[in-house]
Amino acid sequence: STSPPGIRDLLVLGKIRQLETEGAADLIILDAPAAGHAITFLRSATGIAEAATSGALHSQATEALAMLGDPTRTRVMLATLPEETPINELIDTAYSLEEDVGVMLGPVIINGTWPPLPGLETDVEQAAKAADVSLTDDEVVSLGSAGAYRTERCDMQQGQLARLARELPLTTLNLDFVFTNELDQSDLTRLADELLAGIDALDPALTD
């Protein structure tokens, strides 16, 4: 025999609810699946509550719905990249979660933002001359191209973040892109510090 659709997701929600009601921790963080499955996961309680109108399954589902719908107990923090397609997916997911699941959204985490670098608008040859540095023609071209790419990338990201702010007015927590092939402990510490600084700067009403 097969389990009813959503039963496994409901069991996970039930375990989370058990940990929460037992006071197992001050804060329980669930790293949910990607957007499409996350919506299905959180909708599972609604589907089962409607399908099973009585009994243990109905009780489990209604208790899970009560937990999800209470902003003092549950909030969803979405994460995205500052690019067009991920931003589109984030906006669709956010509205679906609010309207279909009834869960309250917390701040959005923006991964991989490129902070603007001052001075990129300066002519490469003028900057080299001011620094008393000699450059070959190839170096001038390469540095100019790199600076133009960095500026274009930053402008694109800022444009997408501005669109996100217009279409989904939620507070954001931005994490800078780490320019390395592999993150080490110092990189993780830096990102954690950035995230904590962003949380500390939030309106207290968002973290109550």
Model-identified regions with their sequence ranges:
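Conserved phosphoryl-transfer catalytic core
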Residues: 1-5
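Conserved catalytic-core segment of NTP-binding enzymes
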Residues: 8-167
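C-terminal accessory extensions appended to soluble enzyme cores
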Residues: 172-174, 178, 182-208
